[in-house]
From Swiss-Prot:
Lineage: Eukaryota, Viridiplantae, Streptophyta, Embryophyta, Tracheophyta
Gene assigned in the entry: ERF056
Compartment(s) of residence: Nucleus
SMART domains reported for this sequence: AP2
Chief location: nucleus
InterPro entries for the chain: AP2/ERF_dom (IPR001471), AP2/ERF_dom_sf (IPR036955), DNA-bd_dom_sf (IPR016177), ERF/AP2-like (IPR051758)
Portion annotated as DNA-binding: 70-127
Signal peptide: none
Name the UniProt record assigns to this protein: Ethylene-responsive transcription factor ERF056
Highest taxon listed in the record's lineage: Eukaryota
CDD domains per record: AP2 (cd00018)
Protein species of origin: Arabidopsis thaliana (Mouse-ear cress)
UniProt keyword Transcription, yes or no: yes
Amino acid sequence: METASLSFPVPNTSFGVNKSMPLGLNQLTPYQIHQIQNQLNHRRSTISNLSPNRIRMKNLTPSTSKTKNLYRGVRQRHWGKWVAEIRLPKNRTRLWLGTFETAEKAALAYDQAAFQLRGDIAKLNFPNLIHEDMNPLPSSVDTKLQAICKSLRKTEEICSVSDQTKEYSVYSVSDKTELFLPKAELFLPKREHLETNELSNESPRSDETSLLDESQAEYSSSDKTFLDFSDTEFEEIGSFGLRKFPSVEIDWDAISKLANS
């Protein structure tokens, strides 16, 4: 068998001349082979270091991304726990209800708090489960909710009392206006009003005829005074003389006489 041979330049220090001598693979020592392999691996590592490093992104399962905003008053912490909060109706601040292992438990806690604050008007995540037995809220949260409900009831009572006082003031003003009406209109019953209206509707003609008779009697009894237009006034007016002014019209007779002469 023929063995492959490689030629490596071997320096000749004695004469100062480089000579290429044939060197076979079988003549390499194990140390030289190991050194060559290390050089090749080093080149591969330098080439791989030049490329950008791959960063593994955080795996987001579709369940977490969907349930993040699925329930009302529930949000997720970055470490995975679920938090329930509710907005108070008056000052619009958030009341913390606690942290829970699942989103459903947090949603049920929100439903309990919302039902205590708003009653049947509340918008719930699970309206069918509100009357069933649920896990109670923490004691601190429950006491806060009860105090808030009491304050809301007090404000509602104050508002209702103020509305009643307004209505009473309106009624009192209407009663005072009735005092200015005549007594006959205040104390007459409805039947008398109807009878008086019927009588007034039945006898309008008799009243009109009586008024005409009275006016005719007054006219006949009173002295008749007429304007006296005598002729003396017209005679006095006719006695005044008017000044004679020269006529503006052309005298054609005088012009014809002058032309003939």
